[in-house]
């Protein structure tokens, strides 16, 4: 069951944490898949298609799960997705009552199904057939055998597969969990993917950190909320659904306090809290990936399970192609359109009233104009009190915000409070005073300066300005002239009308275009042929993979370091906010708590976004464009040089931007 109605509630109350994604966009990722829900999906899909019968072999054993699992595994491998299947083991004691209830419900469904068959009631048959499906231990074992023959890792959980999947996600073995049970979120998996193994439904991505931020709940409160919604490890309160559960948690903070106020009892909730907090999992140090056993797979499918040879040959051909080709990181998945908001059908029909979940606080630095100049959008909309967490609720930073280059440090936007002030405010006119959110560097603790002060940033990656809107014509001319002068390349008159073949993230590219323009008259047919046949020659997929991995590692280490110091940053933000409010109220000694929370959250959010904005998806494209441009230039320079002369690197240095050291511009290298 998972958590009853959770996904439907999140789609209404925190839609920003849910999106629809394509399988193609997951290329290059490793995903832990809850095997039990996947096998159930495969079996029920086939049984629903035929109303009653499953696929079976000559011994009468079901093979529906084998057919579905094999096809889906091959599809995932073809897309460059690395699945890890996790199987349930002995269920925890806290789940015994739930399992007993499920057994009774299944027996009732079997009786109802028999009656529906006798009456030839197709709608009733369709309704009850899914409720009678059960994955046996023998089917589990055959699924494990199949996966090992295919070469897909199999992990047997200590108890619950969802908990083991979440453990793998926390330890960095996988990037997401594929399951239909939402309790993987309660077990602290960062990203949940629903419908991953369904063939006719879009994949739904749920971000835990964003959900907690939008709901304004700590993870402990989120756990209590999910227990009240209904979970597998204890009962729930009568008449309490997701809407009521959320309002109760927001009002009282915990189940124990709710029970105290309502004078009710909830048997087993403490055991459920403990199990969600510290589930029994198998300690994993490595995940071994092996080659597919083609001969063994053929024997298993044809001899043991009576698959047709023709069908098996086609499946094995697809598998070998998927396993033999190198997993390439899809540029489309890097720089494609953002995920669509998910259209989730709620599991309950009562509309949610009185729930005002917070919206995402807009970034102070979220875009650049078309001409490449930094824009500072107006920020006169301060989030409402419901949108601001208290100081002790530190927002998690598991998802890097997608924002553009920060504006100059001396051009930080100001904020105007437009909400109704507290009654203790002495003069209503003071609401209109604008106070800058920037803080003097000298007031920032030394250990926090590298997070808050732009000039103290320690870049792990730098982005070279390469776009047409980022470079002036004089700068481009100077760079190309310097390159040609260093290597003695006879440059001709630039042809501004030269048509350069190119597409993708590398273009438009004024540096490459200018270099090709001045070398177009050289008697070098090979160079001209390169221009015609390739827009990004000189860089292999291996090199591109390394660049991407370098960017990801830099992002992950930056996020990890921010999270480590987040409590101290919040404390400092609170101190700065208090000082700003005092200034705003002309020295008043009172500090309205609502404004303190609002300003603390605002400062923290802006500092975080400015520190991490360099790792957004659009920044990745700019990073790759700069690095690939250098490699392509080196290749083309070498084509212009005589035998025995080689260019290994460009005769250029970089200088950091005066506004942000993460961004650099190329300059001629002195002495070259």
Swiss-Prot record:
Show the CDD domains listed in the entry. Answer: PIN_FEN1 (cd09867)
Q: Look up the record and name the cofactor or cofactors this protein needs.
A: Mg(2+)
Which residue stretches belong to region I-domain? 124-252
- Localization, UniProt: Nucleus, Nucleolus; Nucleus, Nucleoplasm; Mitochondrion
Top-level taxon: Eukaryota
Q: Describe cofactor binding as the record notes it.
A: Binds 2 magnesium ions per subunit. They probably participate in the reaction catalyzed by the enzyme. May bind an additional third magnesium ion after substrate binding.
Q: Where does DNA bind?
A: 47, 72, 160, 230, 232
Major subcellular site: nucleus
- GO BP terms, alphabetized: base-excision repair; DNA replication, removal of RNA primer
The protein's PTM annotation reads: Phosphorylated. Phosphorylation upon DNA damage induces relocalization to the nuclear plasma.
Q: Which UniProt keywords apply?
A: DNA damage, DNA repair, DNA replication, Endonuclease, Exonuclease, Hydrolase, Magnesium, Metal-binding, Mitochondrion, Nuclease, Nucleus, Phosphoprotein
Q: Name one GO molecular function term.
A: DNA binding
According to the record's subunit comment, the protein's assembly and interactions are: Interacts with PCNA. Three molecules of FEN1 bind to one PCNA trimer with each molecule binding to one PCNA monomer. PCNA stimulates the nuclease activity without altering cleavage specificity.
Q: What is the recorded function of this protein according to its Swiss-Prot or TrEMBL entry?
A: Structure-specific nuclease with 5'-flap endonuclease and 5'-3' exonuclease activities involved in DNA replication and repair. During DNA replication, cleaves the 5'-overhanging flap structure that is generated by displacement synthesis when DNA polymerase encounters the 5'-end of a downstream Okazaki fragment. It enters the flap from the 5'-end and then tracks to cleave the flap base, leaving a nick for ligation. Also involved in the long patch base excision repair (LP-BER) pathway, by cleaving within the apurinic/apyrimidinic (AP) site-terminated flap.
Among PANTHER family, the record links this protein to: FLAP ENDONUCLEASE 1, FLAP ENDONUCLEASE FAMILY MEMBER
Protein name stated in the entry: Flap endonuclease 1
Traced from the root, the source organism's taxonomic lineage reads: Eukaryota, Sar, Alveolata, Apicomplexa, Aconoidasida
């Amino acid at each position: 069951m998972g958590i009853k109605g959770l996904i439907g509630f999140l789609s209404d109350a925190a839609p920003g944490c849910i999106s629809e994604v394509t399988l193609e966009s997951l290329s290059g990722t490793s995903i832990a898949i809850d095997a039990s829900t996947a096998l159930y999906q495969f079996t029920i899909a086939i049984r629903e298609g035929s109303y009653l019968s499953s696929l079976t072999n000559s011994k009468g054993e079901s093979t529906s799960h084998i057919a579905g699992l094999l096809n889906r595994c091959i599809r995932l491998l073809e897309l460059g997705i690395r699945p890890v299947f996790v199987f349930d083991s002995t269920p925890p004691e806290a789940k015994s009552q739930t399992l007993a209830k499920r057994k009774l419900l299944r027996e009732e469904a079997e009786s109802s199904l028999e009656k529906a068959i006798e009456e030839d009631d197709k709608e009733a048959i369709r309704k009850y057939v899914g409720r009678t499906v059960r994955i046996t231990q023998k089917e589990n074992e055959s699924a494990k055998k199949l996966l090992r023959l295919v070469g897909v890792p199999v992990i047997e959980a200590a108890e619950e597969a969802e908990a083991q999947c979440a453990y793998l996600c926390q330890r960095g073995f996988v990037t997401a969990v594929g399951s239909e049970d939402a309790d993987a979120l309660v077990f602290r998996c960062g990203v949940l993917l629903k419908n991953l193994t369904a063939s006719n439904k879009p994949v739904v991505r749920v971000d835990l950190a964003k959900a907690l931020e939008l709901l304004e709940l700590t993870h402990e409160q989120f756990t209590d909320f999910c227990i009240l919604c209904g979970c597998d490890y204890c009962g729930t309160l009568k008449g309490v659904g997701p809407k009521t559960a959320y309002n109760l948690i927001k009002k009282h903070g915990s189940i124990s306090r709710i029970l105290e106020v309502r004078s009710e009892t909830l048997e087993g909730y403490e055991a459920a809290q403990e199990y969600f907090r510290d589930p029994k999992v198998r300690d994993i140090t490595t995940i071994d990936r092996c080659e597919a056993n083609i001969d063994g797979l053929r024997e298993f499918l044809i001899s043991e399970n009576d698959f047709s040879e023709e069908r098996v040959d086609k499946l094995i051909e697809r598998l070998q192609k998927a396993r033999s080709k190198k997993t390439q990181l899809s540029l489309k998945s890097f720089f494609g359109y953002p995920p669509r908001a998910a259209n989730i059908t709620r599991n309950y029909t009562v509309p949610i009233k009185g729930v005002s979940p917070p919206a995402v606080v807009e970034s102070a630095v979220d875009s650049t104009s078309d001409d490449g100049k930094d824009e500072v959008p107006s920020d006169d909309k301060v989030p409402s009190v419901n949108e601001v967490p208290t100081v002790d609720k530190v927002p998690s930073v598991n998802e890097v915000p997608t924002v553009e280059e920060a504006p100059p440090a001396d051009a930080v936007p100001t904020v105007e409070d437009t909400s109704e002030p507290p009654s203790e405010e002495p003069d209503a006119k003071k609401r209109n005073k604008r106070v800058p959110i920037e803080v003097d560097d000298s007031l920032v603790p030394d250990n926090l300066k590298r997070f808050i002060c732009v000039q103290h940033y320690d870049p792990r990656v730098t982005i070279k300005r390469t776009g047409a809107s980022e470079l002036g014509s004089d700068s481009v001319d100077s760079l190309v002239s310097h390159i040609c002068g260093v290597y003695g390349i006879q440059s001709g008159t630039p042809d501004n009308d030269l048509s350069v073949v190119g597409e993708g993230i590398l273009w438009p590219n004024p540096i490459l275009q200018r270099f090709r323009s001045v070398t177009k008259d050289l008697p070098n047919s090979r160079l001209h042929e390169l221009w015609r046949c390739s827009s990004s020659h000189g860089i292999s997929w291996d090199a591109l993979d390394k660049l991407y991995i370098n960017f990801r590692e830099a992002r992950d280490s930056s996020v990890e370091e921010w999270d480590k110091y987040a409590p101290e940053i919040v404390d400092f933000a609170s101190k700065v906010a208090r000082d700003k409010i005092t200034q705003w109220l002309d020295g008043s000694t009172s500090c309205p708590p609502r404004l303190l929370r609002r300003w603390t959250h605002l400062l923290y959010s802006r500092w975080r976004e400015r520190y991490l904005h360099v790792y957004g998806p659009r920044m990745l494209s700019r990073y790759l464009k700069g690095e690939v441009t250098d490699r392509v230039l080196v290749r083309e320079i070498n084509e212009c040089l005589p035998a025995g002369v080689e260019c290994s690197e460009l005769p250029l240095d970089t200088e950091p931007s005066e506004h942000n050291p993460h961004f650099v511009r190329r300059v001629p290298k002195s002495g070259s």
